[in-house]
């Protein structure tokens, strides 16, 4: 595939991961690893491996987790719906689920202050 078409496809894909439109400067570091011949191959390999069976097979092990877990999820995530975050929360004993309204998959871009606050609270002694 021509590099310019691949780059446009990757950019469109990554832009869909935020609720707030992402500018080109912010987008750059997200798409750079998926550009060039090796990056293009890696991108499509990752897309083809996006199969629930890979997580479904380890899901029974989640109940064994004995460490504190905080799950941060954007309520407008179009890549992995909030329902999956809720299932994960139910499967991990004692976990916390923190959701962010008007936020998609890349919560650190859509709501950096909320993510920082959640992490600060979670990691505080």
Features from the language model and the residues they span:
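Helix-rich cap/lid subdomain of alpha/beta-hydrolase
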Residues: 1-32, 41-45
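Catalytic active-site module of serine/aspartate enzymes centered on a nucleophile-bearing elbow/loop
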Residues: 94-125
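Conserved serine/cysteine hydrolase catalytic core
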Residues: 24, 35-90, 99
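Conserved catalytic core of Hanks-type protein kinase domains
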Residues: 4, 33, 64, 91, ...
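Residues at helix-coil transition
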Residues: 15-18, 35-36, 93, 124
């Amino acid at each position: 595939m021509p590099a310019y078409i691949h780059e446009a496809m990757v950019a469109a894909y990554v832009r869909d991961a935020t609720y707030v439109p992402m500018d080109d400067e912010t987008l750059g570091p997200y798409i750079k690893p998926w550009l060039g011949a090796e990056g293009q191959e890696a991108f499509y390999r990752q897309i083809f491996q996006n199969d629930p069976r890979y997580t479904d097979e380890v899901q029974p092990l989640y109940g064994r987790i004995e460490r504190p877990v905080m799950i941060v999820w954007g309520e407008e995530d179009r890549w992995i719906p909030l329902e999956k975050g809720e299932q994960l929360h139910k499967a991990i004993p004692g976990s916390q689920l923190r959701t962010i309204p008007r936020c998609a998959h890349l919560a650190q871009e859509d709501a950096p202050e909320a993510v920082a606050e959640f992490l600060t609270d979670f990691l505080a002694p």
